[in-house]
């Protein structure tokens, strides 16, 4: 007699923190996880986050432990919200600088700084620039401590358009075009 083939259990994972919904409370994004779960799986939300379910879960705790758990949850939520706000402010203040630098006579290089603030891998972006503009593009360290992408040729305008088109998370207002000219030696 053939045994029935075992069927795998279907597990739902949170769309926000990627943990099973039962463990979302241990992550830092509990509020967002609850909203996601309520929208996508209302039956599971009712089972985990309904007032009755929460009451049943905390009923076995002592009064002091319940208060401590409530304080911890509030503190964790506030901390996560503050971190998210800080990240949003950092992104709003971050500026991508595209600088056209004259090398000699009619030769130029274009320097791009500030992309790391938007979570982009500079090596991948440099490779994309090299492919798109058919030029050499490399990541170099800046004396001030950061890194920049140096692209051979005068492609500053095209780089701005490319960044806006390919990387939608960079706002247009945060891109700054700058032109550096070498000072001519005075004949005297």
Curated annotation (Swiss-Prot):
Principal location: cytoplasm
CDD domains xref list: DENR_C
Matches recorded under Pfam families: DENR_N, SUI1
Entry-linked PROSITE patterns: SUI1
GO BP of this protein: formation of translation preinitiation complex; nuclear-transcribed mRNA catabolic process, nonsense-mediated decay; ribosome disassembly; translation reinitiation
GO MF annotation list: mRNA binding; translation initiation factor activity
Domain SUI1: 96-167
Record family assignment: Belongs to the DENR family.
Domain writeup: The SUI1 domain may be involved in RNA binding.
Listed name of the protein: Translation machinery-associated protein 22
Organism (species): Chaetomium globosum (strain ATCC 6205 / CBS 148.51 / DSM 1962 / NBRC 6347 / NRRL 1970)
This protein's encoding gene: TMA22
């Amino acid at each position: 007699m053939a045994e029935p083939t075992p069927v795998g259990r279907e597990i739902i994972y949170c769309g926000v923190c990627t943990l099973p919904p039962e463990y979302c409370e241990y992550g830092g994004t509990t509020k967002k996880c609850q909203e996601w779960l309520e929208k996508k799986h209302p039956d599971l939300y009712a089972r985990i986050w309904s007032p009755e379910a929460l009451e049943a879960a905390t009923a076995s705790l002592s009064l002091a432990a319940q208060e401590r758990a409530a304080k911890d949850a509030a503190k964790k939520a506030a901390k996560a919200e503050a971190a998210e706000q800080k990240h949003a402010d950092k992104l709003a203040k971050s500026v991508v600088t595209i600088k056209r630098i004259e090398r000699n006579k009619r030769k130029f290089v274009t320097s791009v700084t500030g992309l790391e603030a938007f979570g982009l891998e500079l090596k991948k972006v440099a490779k994309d620039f090299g492919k798109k503009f058919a030029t050499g593009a490399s990541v170099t360290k800046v004396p001030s401590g950061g890194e920049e992408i140096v692209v051979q040729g005068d492609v500053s305008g095209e780089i701005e358009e490319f960044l806006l088109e390919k990387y939608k998370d960079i706002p247009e207002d945060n891109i700054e075009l700058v032109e550096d000219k070498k000072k001519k030696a005075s004949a005297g």
